[in-house]
């Protein structure tokens, strides 16, 4: 990430998963932008991938998202899952959402081709509530968050296959977020080669919406 100032690296199990422009932004977002590496076992990753592949294969990659936020993608909303996958999604709900939060009944599945990427954007409150939680499959990637008013304040998340990321509150509404394209995919000085990436995204209910109400697909990561 370009820019001056001190770069701070938070480490977990002797490896860095979150890095930022300084201690203040890391402190501010320590509970609002969370990475849990190794959340899925290899078998669980394969369970989700096998279930999603037939449905995704029927769709073509697109290059013009409705709000121009995503390039090289295909996506779907999925509400019917095998029991094995439902068990995984229940673990996501327990890990990321509070007891008072209701989830949207459909799960957003986003498939980025190797050269696909998500441009910086801020989520709309029309499409999902205060929390989103995403499982990363197939390829590592780097998510970058930048403060909308103070671009010198930024955070980067290393999302490896099998990891869970959680964005809440300020991380979603005060910061833009993006998935870096392959040629920009670095975590500090470490190159993170991009391949095809699937994210499985659970979302809390927007305020005032019933859990079964349909909505336009959000530009979620």
UniProtKB/Swiss-Prot annotation:
InterPro entries the UniProt entry points to: AlkB-like (IPR027450), AlkB-like_sf (IPR037151), ALKBH7-like (IPR032870)
What EC number(s) is this enzyme filed under? 1.14.11.-
Q: What is its main location?
A: mitochondrion
Organism (species) = Bos taurus
Free-text comment on the cofactor = Binds 1 Fe(2+) ion per subunit.
Q: Name one GO biological process term.
A: regulation of lipid storage
Give a yes or no for keyword Cell wall biogenesis/degradation in this entry. Answer: no
Subcellular locations according to the entry = Mitochondrion matrix
Question: From which domain of life does this come?
Answer: Eukaryota
The residues forming the transit peptide are 1-23
The UniProt function text for this chain reads: May function as protein hydroxylase; can catalyze auto-hydroxylation at Leu-110 (in vitro), but this activity may be due to the absence of the true substrate. Required to induce programmed necrosis in response to DNA damage caused by cytotoxic alkylating agents. Acts by triggering the collapse of mitochondrial membrane potential and loss of mitochondrial function that leads to energy depletion and cell death. ALKBH7-mediated necrosis is probably required to prevent the accumulation of cells with DNA damage. Does not display DNA demethylase activity. Involved in fatty acid metabolism.
What cystine linkages occur within this chain? none
Q: Which family does it belong to?
A: Belongs to the alkB family.
| Binding residue positions for Fe cation | 121, 123, 177
Molecular-function annotations in GO: dioxygenase activity; metal ion binding
Q: What is the lineage of its organism?
A: Eukaryota, Metazoa, Chordata, Craniata, Vertebrata
Keywords assigned by UniProt, alphabetized: Dioxygenase, Iron, Metal-binding, Mitochondrion, Necrosis, Oxidoreductase, Transit peptide
Q: Which cofactor does it need?
A: Fe(2+)
Q: Give the GO cellular component terms, alphabetically.
A: mitochondrial matrix
Residues that hold 2-oxoglutarate according to the record: 165, 197-199, 203
Q: Does the keyword Calcium apply?
A: no
Q: What is this protein called?
A: Alpha-ketoglutarate-dependent dioxygenase alkB homolog 7, mitochondrial
């Amino acid at each position: 990430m370009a820019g001056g100032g001190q770069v701070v690296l938070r480490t977990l199990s002797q490896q860095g998963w979150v890095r930022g422009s300084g201690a203040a932004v890391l402190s501010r977002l320590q509970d609002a932008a969370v990475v849990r590496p190794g959340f899925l076992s290899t078998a669980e990753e394969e369970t989700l991938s096998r279930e999603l592949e037939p449905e995704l294969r029927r769709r073509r990659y697109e290059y013009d998202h409705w709000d121009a936020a995503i390039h090289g993608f295909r996506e779907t909303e999925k509400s019917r899952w095998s029991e094995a996958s439902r068990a995984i999604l229940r673990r996501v709900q327990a890990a990321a959402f509070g007891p008072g939060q209701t989830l949207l009944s459909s799960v957003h599945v986003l498939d980025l081709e190797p050269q696909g990427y998500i441009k910086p954007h801020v989520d709309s409150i029309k499409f999902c509530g205060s929390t989103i939680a995403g499982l990363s499959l197939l390829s590592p990637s780097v998510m970058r968050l930048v403060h909308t008013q103070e671009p010198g304040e930024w955070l980067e998340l290393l999302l490896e296959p099998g990891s869970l990321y959680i964005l809440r509150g300020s991380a979603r509404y005060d910061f833009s977020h993006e998935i870096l394209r392959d040629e920009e995919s670095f975590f500090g000085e470490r190159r993170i080669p991009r391949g095809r990436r699937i994210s499985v995204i659970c979302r809390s209910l927007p305020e005032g919406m019933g859990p079964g109400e349909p909505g336009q697909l959000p530009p979620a990561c």
